[in-house]
From Swiss-Prot:
Any GO CC annotation of this UniProt entry: nucleus
Example of a GO biological process term: cell fate specification
Organism of derivation: Caenorhabditis elegans
Nucleus as UniProt keyword: yes
Name listed for the protein in its UniProt record: Putative T-box protein 30/42
Known DNA-binding region: 11-192
């Protein structure tokens, strides 16, 4: 790399992060994986245009402190609870693979598929990071030049994008703020002072359109005990736990009344389901020009042993 060139990395949606800095919260729990919003997106400059780079994202704890909301409704170190021990670091490579420097600088580098959870089991997925609630995390981008083969990597801690994983929003306005910016966001605020769709009437607000709809009843079905059979004149489909099989009654390979009439289906001469007396490994009958089918009429072949 040219010594005079310095790589610069910024959050492309930095203004959004600044609105909640340094008190950004992200919903995370052990039951499911949840997205990060604002999303993790970068603008990069200072790369060598014709060099190829690999980009790796990680989420790191900024310190070994457990936090909580103080009397001023701000995040502060908690004196009541001890911090959780550090967990293993995870690295997530950019989904689009390696790219040239000029390509990376011309676009917004996105890690929008990243998810977080407090379940170690769910975090086994490639794009899911395991986090501890009530601790402070920061996205870290690592950039390495593969063309020059340099050992040293450029590491960028994006402190503007630090956040606290929480099971429910600790700040009353966080859920509303995210919902206004992102239609996929849920409220999830704590009960004291938080804005919830269920209590919008009690709070003196008009109920949202979503909450005014009548609940839709859904039948609970155990897929492990359900077999769906759809019969037509051409096929029978059996569906059990999403396993789909097709049954063709007219085929000699599958039809019980025909399976002993034809040693093989003309279009699959070496099929392993050939019944006795012809062994699947014995192909001599196939190359025998005098061979005749067990059928009263050899309707499957012409005189040159080619299937009709």
């Amino acid at each position: 790399m040219n010594p005079s060139t310095q790589i610069v990395v910024k959050m492309s949606n930095e203004e959004l992060w600044k609105e909640r800095y340094p008190n950004m919260e992200m919903i995370s729990n052990s039951k499911r994986i949840t997205p990060i919003f604002p999303e993790i997106k970068f603008k990069i400059s200072g790369l060598e245009e014709n060099s190829r780079y690999v980009l790796v994202l990680s989420l790191e704890k900024m310190d070994n402190i457990r936090y909580g909301i103080n009397e001023n409704k701000e995040w502060a170190p908690s004196s009541a609870r001890k911090p959780k021990p550090h967990h293993n670091m995870k690295f997530f490579f950019h989904p689009e693979g390696t790219k040239l420097g000029k390509e990376l600088m011309a676009e917004t580098v996105e890690f929008t598929s990243v998810r977080i959870t407090t379940s170690e089991k769910l975090s086994e997925k490639e794009n899911v990071f395991y986090v501890h609630t009530m601790h402070k995390y920061v996205p870290v981008l690592t950039i390495r030049n593969l063309t020059t083969g340099e050992i040293a990597s450029n590491i960028f801690k994006m402190e503007i994008a630090q956040f606290f994983p929480v099971s429910i929003y600790q700040q009353a306005s966080m859920g509303r703020w995210k919902s206004d910016l992102n239609k996929h966001s849920t409220f999830g605020n704590r009960s004291e002072g938080g804005i919830k769709r269920k209590t919008s009437d009690a709070a003196g607000q008009l109920p949202s359109k979503r909450s005014s709809k009548k609940p839709v009843k859904k039948d609970v079905v155990d897929n492990s005990e359900v077999t769906l059979e759809v019969k037509t004149s051409q096929y029978l489909v059996n569906q059990n736990e999403s396993n789909l099989t097709e049954y063709i009654p007219s085929s000699p390979l599958y039809s019980s009344q025909n399976q002993y009439q034809y040693p093989f289906h003309p279009y699959s001469p070496f099929d392993s389901s050939i019944p006795y007396p012809y062994s699947p490994m014995d192909y001599s009958y196939y190359f025998n020009p005098t061979f005749q089918s067990f059928s009263p009429e050899n309707v499957y072949f012409d005189e040159n042993r080619n299937p009709h």
